Amino acid sequence: MSRSGRSKSKYLNINIDDVHPETGNYIADCGGDMERGVFKYLLKLIEEFPKIKVTLFVTPNWIDKPNDPILIKLIKKVLGLKYTNEWKDEPFRLDKHIEWCEWLNELVRRGNVEVAIHGLYHHRNSDPHSAEFLGLSYEECITRLLNAERIFETSGLKYVRGFRPPGWGVSEGLFKALKDLNYVFVSLDPLACEINVPRYEVSEFNSLINIPQNWDIKNGKIEEAFEILKKGNILSVKGHIQERYGRDKLNNGLTEESYKNVRKLLIRIEDEGLDLRFAKMEEIANDFRGEKR
């Protein structure tokens, strides 16, 4: 069940999916190239607008690979072969990239950034291949979440108890597992997840605080952002770390174009003198719980 409560504050949060240590030497720079790669656009925004707050959704053991061309995929299906692709030998497991984790920790220590959990593998063995938790049982969800946390702990990467489901794949077992493991917030898209939660409001969902996404980092229009703030209490600026991943085009990655779009939004907000609180998702969730007491 979802329960909305109009918060006294209006918030702005920037949130980025699919962050993991993969570099441009593989399929795409997914954050692994650090300040030399796509992260430079986020760092430029933080330098220009030091009040902004960012939630990075990190996958601790990314094994997902893009789909094959349709014909090859169909042939694999007909032959009864595994038709989803994955990385072997877990090359992007966080505890294999301690230097990268420490670099992210430094961003966390500065106060603008938090790290939340974005699945364990970001992969499943059937379509849709990125919807990792789709249809999983409670026990399977508990196991994956605990394994994800274990990798975060061994890597030393600091994280908060927040979760966004990879590929928007969810199940009742997932929500019960998140509740029982004392997660603070979840971030769901009501349309993609087919779940009845508000798109423009922070709300309570299954004893978790849901913080939606509602404005595209690259394609969002400025007037649309102001309409969202009129309708609700949060402008949640959503993007991916990568613009495309092999054949999979995401079209809202960290690029020069998305940097310019968000910069234009932030300048307009300053010019209008809007009374917004820039906050990380954990801060928003804690505020919401405090106001409900």
Each language-model region and where it sits:
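Acidic/His metal-coordination segments adjacent to aromatic residues that form catalytic metal sites
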Residues: 214-217
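Catalytic alpha-helical scaffold of carbohydrate-active enzymes acting on polysaccharides/glycoconjugates
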Residues: 1-162, 168-207, 219-237, 251-293
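Active-site clefts of carbohydrate-active enzymes
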Residues: 208-210, 238-248
